[in-house]
Regions:
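Generic N-terminal amphipathic, Lys/Arg-enriched alpha-helix
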Residues: 1-11, 23-30
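C-terminal binding/interaction regions
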Residues: 2, 9, 80, 85-156
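Short, glycine/serine-rich, charged loops/turns that create anion-binding
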Residues: 4-5, 38, 64, 128
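Short, glycine/acidic-enriched capping/hinge loops at junctions between secondary-structure elements
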Residues: 9-14, 44-45
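Acidic/glycine-enriched connector segments
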Residues: 18, 26-28, 33-112
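Short, amphipathic alpha-helical "lid/cap" segments that border enzyme active or binding sites
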Residues: 18-21, 153-158
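Short, hydrophobic alpha-helical segments
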Residues: 160-171
Length: 172
């Protein structure tokens, strides 16, 4: 989960997203990402990292049709829904854990959906956006799930895999 290109993120944060994708693939994880139709994003950078490491990628896109920005995704699922909650719900509920990097309103929506669905969230801090604001915080006073903070792509992936394993034990 991460910023779309219109938020003008830095090359540094793009490299971090790429690294997260690469590390997920190296751990034999499947990368689900928000497949954009009209621009690059941190999610597509993660897709490129996963693909370069030989991983499996699943792009969830809005609307109809499979024409997306990142042409190398293995599986593209057009959910028939639009941005702003519908596509994000399909994307997040397909995951055993989510990793947020930077992020604007779309990332915040995805984190709120994960929180409500009891899906573990890891926030890679140090790159701004909602990930920085929510690292090691709860989304509200109910304190359902702590957003797990991480300081590096390696730590984020390690923590996400550990949290995902616990999630699968609880909900298998």
């Amino acid at each position: 989960m991460g910023s779309a290109a219109d938020l003008k993120y830095s090359k540094e944060v793009e490299r971090a997203a790429y690294e997260v994708g690469r590390l997920i693939a190296e751990e034999d994880g499947i990368l689900f990402f928000g497949a954009e139709k009209d621009s690059d994003s941190l999610s597509t950078a993660a897709c490129r990292g996963a693909k370069d490491a030989g991983g499996l990628t699943v792009g969830i896109t809005y609307g109809k049709g499979k024409d997306i920005w990142e042409k190398d995704a293995d599986i593209i699922i057009p959910c028939g829904l639009e941005r702003g909650g519908g596509r994000e719900t399909v994307l997040v509920t397909g995951c055993d854990a989510v990793i947020a990097i930077s992020g604007g309103s779309g990332t915040l929506t995805e984190l709120a959906i994960a929180y409500q669905a009891d899906i573990p969230m890891v926030a890679l801090a140090g790159y701004g956006g909602w990930a920085d604001k929510l690292a090691d915080e709860y989304l509200d006073t109910r304190n359902r799930i702590l957003t797990i903070g991480a300081a590096s792509p390696e730590e984020a992936v390690k923590k996400a895999f550990a949290a995902a394993a616990e999630y699968r034990r609880r909900y298998a």
